[in-house]
Amino acid sequence: MALTSYICFNCRNSYRLKTSLRNFSTTRPYRDLLRPATAPKPTPDVKHIRQNADLYAQNCIDRNYVAHAGHPSKIQQLSEEARQLDHDLKTPRSRIKQLEKTIAKLHIATRQGTDGNTNEKDLSPSEELAELKSEAQRLKDDSQSMTERKATCTEEINRLALSLPNLSSPFTPIGHDPTLVQYLNFNAQEPPTWTRQSPTELQARSHVTIGTELKLLDFTSSATTTGWGWYFLINEGAMLEQALVQYALSTARRRGWKTVAPPSIVYSYIAEACGFQPRDAHNEQQIWSIEQNERDKNTKPQRSLTGTAEIPLAAMYAGRDMNASELPIKLVGASRCYRAEAGSRGVDTKGLYRVHEFTKVELFGWADSVDGAVPSSDDMFNELLDMQMEILTALNLPCRVLEMPSGDLGASATRKRDIEALFPSRLRAASGGAATPVDPEIHYLESAWGEVTSASICTDYQSRRLAARVRGGGAKESRFPHTVNGTAMAVPRVLAAILENGWDAERGVVVIPEVLRPWMDGMESIGRS
């Protein structure tokens, strides 16, 4: 009978894969997540953290991880304790070996009927054996206790190290205020005419109003079927979504990015390895997990809905070795994304700007981390930005590019740039207590900007947690590659921006960007039926 390559999950869970290329974790839960033997074993850079504890502590403060600021010094303490335990174990282990040899000789002497006693207490062989065995057992108990404590220290060191955010790049502004890099399709000296419209006129320019009137959006039905945070795209609205996806994919393919259709469900430990936590710093739910029955909770790893295709695209190479000749690896994938968005308030909750389920096209790349690598992760980061700016410029959306501050980087990124578009519907939320304006010259527009894309460098943060390595390429040792990721198209937000910025009130139509028309049956505008 022919054998297939299929192995059931329970067998995989009990069978350790035999490979010299990758070590996997044990089945012990890590941070309350069941991890099977096939799960990638994370490898934090404990040595670098231990040697630069002050740097990591300050980085935690800069990045809003204040509760983690004590972890680096704790890692130092635990490392010293583990080192001392390792030293202290040498004496009892050596003594145990001596005792075992002596005990063996006494056993032989006893069987041969000779007197093998060498003790000064003039004990009988049986008495000496009992005494030696007692000492050996005591030393073994002490050794076991120290060994277990050392293992506990090592486990705690890894847990603390893995909880730390990535170090921020030299380009990253420290604090909470981003830095303006440039504008796209926007002149600060001549802002759009709608910026001078009344609140009533701005309300008429909202994508909710436009989309409902032109029968592109249906929030009434979604309120019945699913609730807040969902929507129906109908008629030309549904066509616009597909046009945006195809335009983003075609742009990426033209630049040599490989198309992937990824799953939208992953193991929860995979999402965590990529830097996505179930709850944010305010304990608000961010990721939806698939409910398990009581029997499965202790036998099967939990799964989660992905908030971005970044997670499954990164996981494609989890636990694998890449040859340097394979790099760079450039992937683009369209997927449905799911976000809890707990704690959202105000204008963000209206319409398409902040929703629970949406379509997004994501870019993800791997670059060699060795010095002099071509392309480097910085090169790929710049390629991502160029692509994002090309897409948004062609869509005729007024945008600004921001270098994001340390307080907005999350856990995995060392550097992040966001691109924000102008939304007329968000301008009406302006208030005197708004955040510090990025451009004081047009401070009154600050609330109207909304993020539509993001690009990040994660250095080796994700590859260390996903156990992905690079070999070859002139370097003797394997190393952890760098990862970059970015949004090619966040459909709901870009669609909303097109409706609001492309609205022609006099004609009662939305002008369709020229680059989308091939996927819109050649339509130039969407108007009233």
Which sequence ranges carry the predicted segments?
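N-terminal alpha-helical targeting/anchoring segments
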Residues: A2-T195
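TRNA-recognition modules of translation machinery and tRNA-sensing kinases, especially anticodon-binding
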Residues: A69-H71, E81-Q84, D88, F186-S529
